[in-house]
Amino acid sequence: MLSHRLSALAGQGWAQRILLPWAILGPLWAQVTIRGAVLDKEGDAVVGAIVRLLPTNKGTLTNAEGLFSISGVPPGEYTLQVTAVGIDTLRETIKADARRPVITLKLTAATSAVELSTVEIIESATPAKIDPTRVTVAVTPIAPRQIYTLPSFGVPDVAQYLQVLPGVVFTGDQGGQLYIRGGTPIQNLTLLDGAIIYSPFHTLSLFSIFETDILRQVQVYSAGFGAEYGGRISSVMDIRTRPGNFERFSGRAYATPFVAGALTEGPLPFIRNSSWILSARQGYIQQATPRLYPYLKDSLPFQFQDLYGKVTFGRGPDQLNLFGFRQTDRVDLGAQGVNSWQQWGAGGFFTNLPQASRVRITGSFAYSRFQNTFESPFELRPRYSEIGGFNGGFTFSYLFGADELAYAIEVRGFSTDFLFTNGLGFITQQRQSNTEGASYVRYQKVFRQETLSEEGTPTFFTRAIIEPSLRLHFYNNYGYLSVEPRLRAKLNGRRWSLQTAAGRYVQNWVSAVSDRDIVVLFQGFLTAPEIAANAQLSHPLQEAYHLTLGGEYQLLSAFLLNVEGWYKRFTQLTNINRERLFPEDPTFITEIGYAYGVDLALRYQTPTLSLYGTYSYQYNRRDDFRQVYFPLWDRRHTANLVGSYTWGPWQNVRRGRERRWEASLRWTLGSGLPFTQTLGFFEKLLFIPNGSQNPYSTQQGILAILLSPHYNAARLPAYHRLDLALKYRQRLSETLLLETTVSLLNAYNRPNVFYIDRITARRYNQLPIMPMLGLTLLW
C-alpha cells in the first residue's frame, strides 16, 4: 500500500515534496492505543494482571490502580486476554480502527471458583512476591486484612500495625509519639482521601482516628517519596478509604472493653452504581478501667469518638466520592488539668478516564480543621491551638504502554491561631494565614518491558524502572519558591530487585511542642517563624535531603527478604527554645541533624501460616549549636515478630470465606531510649519582668531541677512485650457471621518504663498485662 502511494505521487513536483512525508507517516499515525482498567467484582483494581493482545506478542501488566495501556496497535481485529491469580480469564474481542485512535475499556473480572482458596490467601496478607510494576523502596502498603491479623488492644487499628514496621519508633502507649525513620510527627504528612489530617492518632496512642474496616489501603512512605507529595520533610502516610457496598445493605458492629462501634453500608436508592458507607466508634476507657482492671495503679483517663461518612457515584475508573469526618479526644488528668481536641473536615475527589483521550484525570478538594485546648490550675492561661485550611488540585496522567507521564497543579491555604504562656508569664502568640501553590511533573520510564510466553506468564519481569520527578512549591508569605527534585528507580531480575530513592524536601509547619518532650498531650501548630538569631538563613523553612538504597530477594516461593539502608540530612530544623529566660530571648531556635539506619524485613506466606519479622538499626543526631545530642526517639535497635495461623472449616457467608479459628502473636523488642539525668534540686527565685517582683531576700522560690549538662546522655532499660490473640468465627446464617476474640496484651507482664517523675522519683510504666474479650457481628 505504501509503495502504491509513493508511485502515485511521483512526478508531481511541489505536491510530491509536501505530501510524501504524510504518505509515509500516515500508516504510523493510524495505529491505535488500547487502554483500560481491570476491576474485581467489588470494583477494586486488579494489580499485576497479565494483559495480552492476541495473536500479537504485545502485552503488559496492570499497574497499582489496575490500569493498562497497549500502544502501536495496527488496525484489525484482536482478542484481548486478561489473566491473574484468583479471577476467571477475561477475553474481549477488539476491533482496532484508525478512525478511533484510542479504545478505552472497563473490564470486570469474576472470582474463579477453582482459585477461590488462593484468593483468600492473597486477601489475608500481602503476597510474598516482588512487585514488578512499580518502585517500592521505602514504601510499605498495608491492607486491612493485615491489620486484622495483629493481636489488638480491643479492636484492630492501623496505629498498632504501624509500630511493627521497620524504621518506626514508638515512645509510649499514653501520649507517646510515632517517629518514622528519624522524623518527628510534625514532619509526617497524613492524608485521608486527599484531605490533610493534623492529628492522626488519639492521645491513647494505640488508636488512630481511622476505622479499620473503611480502609482500602494505607501507603506509608518512610523516605524518598516522589514529587506528588510535598510540604513535609520526613515521611508520608496516604490513606484511602473504600466505597460502600454497591449490591446490598451490609455492615458490622463490635464491642470490646474499651471501644464499641458500628459500620453500615449499601447502595443509594434510585441511583445506579452508587453507594454509601458510615462508621462510628466511641472509646469509654476512662469508665471501663476501674471496673475491669482494678489492679491498675492509675486509671486510663481517655475518651474519644470517631465519625466518618462517604458516598460514591460510579464504579471503576470513572468515579466521584464525597466524604466527611469528625473526631474528638479528651484526657482528664484530675488536678493536673484537662486536655481536649476536636478535628473535622469534608471533601471530595474524582477519577475520570475519557473514552477518546489518552489522559486520565483525577482531582480533589478538601477542608479540615483542628482545635486543641489544655486547661490547668497551675498555668496562668489555657493553652490554645487551632489550625485549619483547604487543599486541592488536579492531576493529569498518560500511559504510553508501560511508561507513564503525570503532571499536576495544587493549591493550599491555611490559618493558625496559637496562644501559650510559660511559667514566667512570657506569652507566645501567633495568628497567621498562609497560601501555597505547587506543581509537579513525574515520568516513569520502563526501559525493558516483560516478554510474555505462549502460556501467558512472564518469561522475565520488567528490567528497569526510572521515575524522575520535580516539584515546585511556592510559599507566598515568604516569597520563596522551593525547587525539589526527586528520583526513584528499580532494577528487576527474576528473583531479585535493586532500588533507590532520593530527593530534597521542604516544609512550612512547626510544632509548638519541643522535640525533647516524651509525653505529648497538647499539640500546637505554627507556621515557620523568623528566627533573628539565624538571620543569615535564606529562608525560615525546614529542609531535608533523603537517600535510600534497597534490595529484595525471593528466597523460595513463600519467602521474601527486603533490605534497605537510608540516610536523612536535616539541614535546617526549627525547635522550641527551652533555654528562654528573658523576653528578648528567641522563642525558637534553629538546629541541624542527621539520621541513618538499616532495616530488614522477612515475610513468609502459605495458605494457613503468615510470618513477618523485622529488624531495624537506627542512629539519630541533633545539633542546636550549643551541643550535639541524641533526640529522645533515638532507639538503636528494634525487632518485631508477627505471626498468624488459621485452621478449621471454612465459614461461608456472602461477604466471603473465613477459616473458623485464627491464632496470632506479636513480639516487640526495643533498646532503651535516651534521657537526661537529674543532678539535684535548687530554689529558683522568680523575677517577673513587669517590675512587681518580690524582694529576693524574703521571697520563697520554687523548686527547680538541676539537670546534667549532657543532654540525653543516659539510656532507659530495654522495652519488650508479647501480645497474643485467639479468634473464633461462627456462621449464624447465610449472611451473619459472629467473631469472638480473646486477646492478652503484655502476656508476661513486662514492666516497661514510660517515664520517671524527676521530683518524686516515681516510675510510670507502660500498660501491664491486660486480658480482653471482643465480639463482632458481621452481616
Outline where the language-model segments fall:
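Gram-negative outer-membrane beta-barrel transporters
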Residues: W566-R569, F588-G672
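Short, acidic, small-residue-rich periplasmic hinge/interaction motif at the N-terminus
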Residues: L39, D44, A49-L54, T83-V85, ...
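Periplasmic N-terminal accessory/gating domains of Gram-negative outer-membrane beta-barrel systems
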Residues: E120-F225, V236, R242-P243
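C-terminal beta-signal and adjacent terminal beta-strands/loops
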Residues: Q303, G656-W661, T668-I702, L716-D723, ...
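Transmembrane beta-barrel wall of Gram-negative outer-membrane proteins
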Residues: R35, F258-Q282, Y295-R330, A335-Y367, ...
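Surface-exposed extracellular loop regions of Gram-negative outer-membrane beta-barrel proteins
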Residues: Q371, G493-L547, G565-D585, R666-L679, ...
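Short, acidic Ser/Thr/Gly-rich low-complexity loop/linker segments typical of extracellular
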Residues: T56-L67
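Outer membrane beta-barrel strand-and-loop segments of large Gram-negative receptors
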Residues: G389-G393, Q430-Y440, Q536-P540, H546, ...
